[in-house]
Amino acid sequence: MASTVLYNSLTTSTTVFLRSHLPISSSSPNDELHHQSSVISNCNYYLKKSSFGGQRKKLKENNNYVKAAAVAESLKTYPNEVAGDVPEKKLRILVAGGGIGGLVFALAAKKRGFDVKVFEKDLSAIRGEGKYRGPIQVQSNALAALEAIDMDVAEKVLAAGCVTGDRINGLVDGVSGNWYVKFDTFTPAVERGLPVTRVISRMTLQQILAEAVGEEVITNESNVVDFKDDGNKVSVTLDNGKTFEGDLLVGADGIWSKVRTNLFGHSDAVYSGYTCYTGIADYVPADIDSVGYRVFLGNKQYFVSSDVGGGKMQWYAFYKEAPGGVDQPNGMKQRLFDIFEGWCDNVIDVIIATDEEAILRRDIYDRTPKLTWGQGRVTLLGDSVHAMQPNLGQGGCMAIEDSYELALTLDKAWQKSVESGRPIDVASSLKSYEGARRLRVGVIHGLARLAAVMATTYKSYLGIGLGPLSFLTKLRIPHPGRVGGRFFITPAMPLMLRWILGGNSEKLEGRIPYCSLSEKASNNLQRWFEDDDALERALTGEWTLLPQGSVAGSLKPICLSRKEDEPCIIGGVFHKDSSGMSVALSSPQISEKHAQITCKNGAYFVTDLGSEHGTWITDNEGRNYRLPPNFPTRFHPSDVIEFGTDKKAVYRVKVMATPPKASQNSPSAAVLQTA
């Protein structure tokens, strides 16, 4: 069961994660200047024609549309609700589970005047779920639903999160690191005036929600083990024997829901086929300003890494095997190196940067959504009825959407009962909520499973997984499935993201679409989507040649200059007359003036200067070739450059960004690390 913290111990963090990747204290969300400078209903974003057709909206800056104006407009429509004068509705709602879904629903119901009581099992959200699952991705659709529920709470969540939706995200080949398909999660949000996707510490999110719900609503150390529905009231029984009575019960007690079991009997969760290792590392990649998250694809395994702010990266490593596996003590990191041997530097480097103690493992389960979510005065929401695989990052988002829809449906039913003078029909209201959510949840649940199937069947080259024919892999022939998959995914992905992120926005009553200047993406975003070369040139780290091989210990790293008039000369002796840097390598196969490395427009080139034994490059797809003399050849991150053929001067190209020292000991960094 997901759970929350004891309310009395809550102190909501004021630390936010901005694109600087340093924790910065935020001003109060109620600060007038904060609103006027950061939230505007029309922004100066100009979005080119999208890949899925149709003209993207041109949104111009207009200072007349500050958030205060939006609030004033909503005051006209919903004066009582915005002013906080919500008439109390004589309907008592019991909620089993104080995880994200349970707390969001409790907040939504409380805001609409209902009497809510949340029963929470223990502190597993901090010690268990929060520890195992780390920061959570809250996507645009869920953030918009939060805004429709409580704008002040939503602003705290927005301020505490690290924006990832304003950068490149997508799928890459796990071995080469080359882009397979890029995701645009920015445009679908801005087109509909939705907040841009963020990641936030799970603990921080639950603290914000619990503080808003209130101490008087949450009862900790209270595990709902049974209930009775007599048609007029529902009574719940806790594991300590206490009973409570209400007008309806909402089961938000997670994938192992006791409410679900009591409703429909025992049913096994569905094993996804994957075990998952996860961790958080003090690590900042060189493309942190241009890439939010990546999914690295492989055959029967895949790896996900995401910026979570504060100089940290969160990662998940999925591996197809039977459930219940156990690693050797302190052996998880080594097993990851074994599983992902030969994969690209982006995967290996973040594993290297992760402490063994920070790595956790769990098997991944989901539940097939039921056509019937409840009976009588009892219903379910979130993982208790449609637990999803984490591949789309929509599990928690769907719970938030569920919460909004259920609170809205009950509110409308109450208003109808007041107008008609008849008692509220709770059972019919719950059925209406279930019907409104069933299709959307079912489709997204299916897409999450489909994403896992894609990862299972992905093969970069012909010969992978073919046993005796595996030698074909060395020929580097693109696998037909890889080619065909890209042909399908490229046009389908924008449509899918547009529906996932924006498909629920029209149901959010009273929410006024707006854009935030603080979420403005780079002017180069569109170019990065279209041009991998431009994305590489945007790297902000230091280009370095790192020695590798058996004699690496006798060589020193070579740090390359970005200045075009400062070349690096590689040779057997120092060249004092060089306008840049001179590196002397002691090897019989290194010519006196062997090669030259130059930078032009952010790209690096190596030129063999007519050396006897040549200069060689092995690229990220394993192709090895000798450079033609006196002809500049571009090289890329992860390429291997060899001067001569005796393996005594071999270097790997790395682009490294050092995480800020301030982030390592900051309170926010500590929160993320323990999450």
Curated annotation (Swiss-Prot):
The keyword Plastid applies. Its cofactor is FAD. It is an enzyme of class 1 (oxidoreductase). GO terms for cellular component: chloroplast thylakoid membrane. It comes from the Eukaryota. FAD binds at residues 92-120, 370-383. Transmembrane segments: none annotated. Its EC number is 1.14.15.21. It is found in: Plastid, Chloroplast thylakoid membrane. Converts zeaxanthin into antheraxanthin and subsequently violaxanthin. Involved in the epoxidation of zeaxanthin. Inhibited by diphenyleneiodonium (DPI). GO terms for biological process: abscisic acid biosynthetic process. It catalyses: all-trans-zeaxanthin + 4 reduced [2Fe-2S]-[ferredoxin] + 2 O2 + 4 H(+) = all-trans-violaxanthin + 4 oxidized [2Fe-2S]-[ferredoxin] + 2 H2O. It comes from Spinacia oleracea. Residues 1-25 form a transit peptide. Keywords: Abscisic acid biosynthesis, Chloroplast, FAD, Flavoprotein, Membrane, Oxidoreductase, Plastid, Thylakoid, Transit peptide. FAD enhances the epoxidase activity while other flavins such as FMN or riboflavin are without effects. The keyword Hydrolase does not apply. Pathway: Plant hormone biosynthesis; abscisate biosynthesis. Residues 558-622 form the FHA domain. Its main location: plastid. This is Zeaxanthin epoxidase, chloroplastic. GO terms for molecular function: FAD binding; zeaxanthin epoxidase activity. Pfam families: FAD_binding_3, FHA.
